């Protein structure tokens, strides 16, 4: 165990220790240092800097007509391989229906009641050959990021929720949600109006952690 611990990246250990300190300092005392966010120099940067995963929503419903259509129209401008645009989005606002679906996701316990739940899938018929076997996840991930930014840009908040499930869980989700076999589930996205006093978020890693050389 000692040798294994010594092999870990010191930066990873420090990040874990910082997360524990954050939980004690911010979540229990309610202090949110403003210095943890980078200053934006223009409106575009402001959107990118201030988007956060929101886990606490107001109870107000999300209008499924004008707002959602606008969000999806913006999200659909995301790039994709050969411009295949293979994404699909399903929406759920009924709490009982949401609970049925999220019971298979098993990672939403820290999120307040969700005004609108989105389920993002990718049509794998758009890809062919072994060289494109992972392209669905790349295109799906790019689309989800564009979707999150579109939600933020239109005045709403969101939280992506992964679907790292077993084959049996995935099969049950397909059956419940009516997802055909040629679509792969990318993730869920919770959407709504942000609570004015959400739980404090953890620190972001510095740019030095991003550089690979």
Question: For each predicted feature, which ranges?
Answer:
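Acidic, surface-exposed loops and disordered segments
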Residues: 1-213
């Amino acid at each position: 165990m000692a040798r294994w611990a010594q092999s870990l990246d010191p930066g990873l250990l420090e990040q874990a220790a910082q997360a524990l300190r954050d939980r004690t300092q911010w979540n229990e005392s309610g202090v949110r240092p403003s210095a943890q966010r980078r200053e934006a120099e223009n409106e575009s940067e402001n959107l990118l800097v201030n988007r956060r995963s929101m886990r606490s929503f107001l109870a107000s419903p999300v209008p499924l007509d004008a707002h959602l259509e606008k969000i999806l129209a913006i999200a659909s401008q995301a790039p994709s391989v050969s411009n295949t645009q293979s994404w699909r989005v399903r929406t759920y606002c009924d709490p009982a229906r949401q609970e049925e679906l999220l019971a298979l996701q098993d990672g939403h316990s820290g999120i307040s009641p969700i005004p609108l739940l989105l389920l993002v899938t990718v049509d794998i018929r758009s890809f062919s050959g072994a060289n494109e076997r992972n392209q669905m996840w790349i295109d799906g991930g790019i689309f989800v990021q564009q979707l999150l930014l579109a939600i933020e840009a239109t005045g709403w908040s969101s939280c992506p929720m992964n679907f790292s499930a077993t084959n049996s869980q995935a099969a049950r989700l397909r059956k419940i949600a009516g997802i055909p076999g040629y679509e792969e589930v990318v993730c869920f996205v919770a959407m709504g109006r942000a609570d004015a006093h959400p739980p404090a978020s953890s620190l972001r890693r510095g740019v030095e952690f991003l550089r690979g050389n």
